[in-house]
UniProtKB/Swiss-Prot annotation:
It is found in: Nucleus. GO terms for biological process: chromatin remodeling; DNA replication; regulation of DNA-templated transcription; response to mercury ion. It comes from Dictyostelium discoideum (Social amoeba). This is Probable histone-binding protein rbbD. The gene is rbbD. Keywords: Chromatin regulator, DNA replication, Nucleus, Repeat, Repressor, Transcription, Transcription regulation, WD repeat. It comes from the Eukaryota. Probably binds directly to helix 1 of the histone fold of histone H4, a region that is not accessible when H4 is in chromatin. InterPro entries: G-protein_beta_WD-40_rep (IPR020472), Histone-bd_RBBP4-like_N (IPR022052), WD40/YVTN_repeat-like_dom_sf (IPR015943), WD40_repeat_CS (IPR019775), WD40_repeat_dom_sf (IPR036322), WD40_rpt (IPR001680), WD_repeat_RBAP46/RBAP48/MSI1 (IPR050459). One of its GO terms (cellular component) is nucleus. GO terms for molecular function: histone binding.
């Protein structure tokens, strides 16, 4: 019986994917699909962009990891991405089955290329780049340690012995975890959370060149279950937030000790992720196993501002756009990345539109056929997103401009089409 149900589900997923491919020319200005050798649990853009004279593309980079079988070597990876520089360079908008893309850029054969592989001990649960130094990458590992890699001090090809040699190992946790966050305003300050119910903070600038390990500067305790995610505030350099399986959102201030300053039961189920708004200092979003994304005002955490409802399964990642104050995206087990525009909350809808989703649901990316593990807004190109899923696929995509620019007929038509994909 289970096998029959799985077969039916697989057929449904494949049919949805075919529908998505048919509609990509109307929904996207760009889609690039790249099959990785192994699934990546993490993806993050490097905030660097190189343009070349007389070339129809720019060169950007993303960091990835591997999640291999137990017998295979794991890697932290840096990939080079060729992105079209403007609409004039984009070929006719049709989905190319052989290349897996919309919006090609001429004769560039490899749009995505792995240019550096660094041996890693176990799978890379998450990898994030330091904002102040783009060669410094922190990784969450399958052990209790957090690794720091300086990519300039590692060869482009991994050493054949498979030895993992991070430039620094950060200690303090007792178990593995996923959440990790660099302080955008204090260089070297790193937060990590863990299944051991704790949050650790390090200042890696305190490590001498001879140090191979660094103990946590502070350990924060307040959660009563697994801490799933942690994030520094973008504006106030002593504030951070955390969420966990105890259903709690906690706000902390490093100046007041190691206990939270605000605690709220944020959802009816485990809380898996959070994101502070880079523009509005009081706005924070949380995503949960209860399938919703919640919006909160830090000045009044007793009352939820709004619930974003469209996902059909657990929400595992949420991120505000670095370019637009009212835009955020979320992803999860339903194989979808939803893009939301909070400025549209409360807009009037007819019954047909309301059946397709709330007015603030701007876009549904339906290009993956398995649970989406992570996504990342491109800091260099507004509306460009990279996403990775358990189907080994890395996709880099940008919704059609008429969807986010036009608030009337074009938006309505695009949203109806897109809603059909999400059915």
């Amino acid at each position: 019986m289970t096998t029959q149900m799985e077969d039916v589900e697989e057929k449904v997923i494949n049919e949805e994917y075919k529908i998505w491919k048919r509609h990509t020319p109307f929904l996207y200005d760009m889609v690039i699909t790249h099959a990785l050798e192994w699934p990546s649990l993490t993806v993050a853009w490097l905030p660097v962009k190189t343009s070349q004279p007389n070339k129809p593309y720019s060169i950007e980079k993303v960091i990835l990891g591997t999640h291999t079988s137990d017998e295979e070597q794991n890697y932290l990876m840096v990939a080079k991405v060729h992105l079209p520089v403007d609409e004039a360079s984009i070929e006719s908008l049709k989905y190319d089955d052989t290349k897996g893309e919309v919006g090609g850029i001429g004769n560039v054969s490899e749009k995505i290329e792995i240019i550096q592989k660094i041996n890693h001990e176990g799978e890379v649960n998450r990898a994030r780049v330091m904002p102040q130094n783009h060669s410094i990458i922190a990784t969450k590992t399958v052990s209790s340690e957090v690794y720091i890699f300086d990519t300039t001090k590692h060869p482009l090809e991994p050493t054949p012995d498979g030895k993992c040699s991070p430039n620094l190992k950060l200690t303090g946790h007792k178990k593995e975890g996923y959440g990790i966050s660099w302080n955008p305003r204090k260089e070297g300050h790193l937060l990590s959370c863990s299944d051991d119910q704790s949050i650790c903070m390090w200042d890696i600038s305190a490590a001498s060149k001879s140090d191979s390990t660094l103990d946590a500067l502070n350990i924060y305790n307040g959660h009563t279950s697994i801490v799933e995610d942690v994030a520094w505030h973008y504006i106030h350099d002593t504030f951070f937030g955390s969420v966990g399986d105890d259903k709690k959102l906690m706000i902390w201030d490093t100046r007041t000790g190691t206990k939270p300053i605000h605690v709220v039961e944020a959802h009816n189920s485990e809380v898996n992720c959070l994101s502070f708004n880079p523009f509005c200092e009081f706005l924070v979003a949380t995503g949960s196993t209860d399938k919703t994304v919640a919006l909160w005002d830090m000045r009044n955490l007793g009352n939820r501002l709004h619930s974003l409802i469209s996902h059909t399964d657990e929400v595992f990642q949420v991120q505000f756009s670095p370019h637009n104050e009212t835009v955020l995206a979320s992803c999860g087990s339903d194989r979808r990345v939803n893009v939301w525009d909070l400025s549209r909350i409360g807009e009037e809808q007819n019954n047909e539109d309301a059946a397709d989703g709330p007015p603030e649901l701007l876009f549904i990316h339906g290009g993956h056929t398995s649970k989406i593990s992570d996504f990342s807004w491109n800091p260099n190109d507004p509306w460009s997103i990279a996403s990775v899923a358990e189907d080994n696929i890395l996709q880099i995509w940008q919704m059609a401009e008429n969807i986010y620019n036009d608030r009337e007929d074009d938006l309505e038509n695009s949203k109806v089409t897109n809603a059909q994909i999400g059915e």
